[in-house]
């Protein structure tokens, strides 16, 4: 795992850091950029590592203090037996912010990281936030995502966990990616144990938990989605007083990679015009 992450180029001055959570778990993050600059904290999705945000680390670490977080059971963080539920995952983000000196941050959550970020807000409020960026997951708004059941008929042959994860990783992209990179992502994702991975896919809270959280946020919000969540983005834009939304129609789930230049430009504009001029 560590070898895989070392194969990816790191931003100049990027360093591996660790901290202990309030329940005694050692978690990892990548740190880059000037410590005195505004801090961006990137939270990855289900089973994904911090280094999936490498393009953002490279792009923003010249002018911003960039943190890419490995949640518990992911990347180079410890793999405890418990804590794979929203309250603990939100508390882990709170512990990370405390480890960074209790500074205010721009929190950027992608996929499951959206829910973990909203869990943090639900329990801790927005007092430590400069802004909130949420990428391609439901925020509890209407309409609820539609999940299509498997059509009737013979079940397809069962495949192993490695093949399933490899297929999942490749499904995140609409644009071609290097096979070595995809293999590294798959290898890293498989580090999350099956029981923990399953728990992360079934958080025991109602949809209103996420919706209640996002409507308590008074700081600027940027919500970027792919077309399946366009209606949620439209409703959030209409109902929330401090939100920007966008739909990336040609991107896969990992839109910050598939359309990295567009995303980095949009995030930079959000930082300059909404977050840092409050």
Regions inferred by a protein language model and the residue ranges of each:
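Flexible "cap/lid" loop of the alpha/beta hydrolase fold
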Residues: 118-123, 127-160
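Active-site loop/oxyanion-hole signature of alpha/beta-hydrolase fold enzymes
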Residues: 22, 30, 68-108, 112, ...
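Alpha/beta-hydrolase active-site loop signature
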Residues: 47, 71-75, 114, 139, ...
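Alpha/beta-hydrolase fold catalytic core
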Residues: 1-41, 62-64, 101-103, 183, ...
């Amino acid at each position: 795992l560590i070898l895989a992450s070392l194969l990816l180029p790191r931003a100049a001055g990027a360093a591996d850091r660790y901290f202990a959570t309030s329940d005694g778990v050692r978690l990892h993050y990548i740190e880059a950029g000037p410590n005195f600059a505004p801090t961006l904290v990137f939270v990855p999705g289900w089973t994904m590592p911090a280094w999936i945000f490498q393009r953002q680390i490279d792009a923003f670490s010249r002018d911003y203090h960039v943190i890419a977080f490995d949640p518990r059971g992911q990347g180079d963080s410890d793999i405890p037996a418990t804590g794979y539920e929203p309250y603990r995952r939100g508390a882990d983000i709170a512990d990370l912010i405390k480890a960074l000196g209790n500074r205010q941050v721009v929190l950027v959550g992608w996929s499951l990281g959206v829910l973990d970020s909203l869990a943090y807000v639900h329990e801790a409020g927005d007092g430590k936030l400069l802004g909130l960026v949420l990428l391609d997951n439901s925020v509890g708004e209407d309409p609820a995502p539609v999940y299509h059941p498997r059509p009737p008929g013979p079940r397809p042959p069962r495949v192993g966990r490695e093949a399933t994860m490899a297929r999942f990783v490749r499904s995140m992209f609409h644009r071609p990616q290097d096979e070595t990179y995809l293999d590294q992502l798959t290898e890293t994702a498989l580090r999350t144990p099956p029981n923990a991975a399953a728990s992360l896919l079934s958080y025991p809270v109602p949809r209103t938990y996420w919706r209640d959280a996002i409507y308590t946020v008074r700081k600027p919000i940027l919500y970027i989605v792919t077309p399946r969540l366009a209606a949620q983005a439209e409703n959030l834009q209409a109902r929330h007083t401090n939100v920007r939304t966008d739909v990336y129609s040609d991107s896969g789930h990992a839109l910050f990679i598939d359309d990295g230049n567009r995303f980095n430009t949009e995030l930079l504009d959000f930082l300059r015009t909404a977050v840092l001029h409050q």
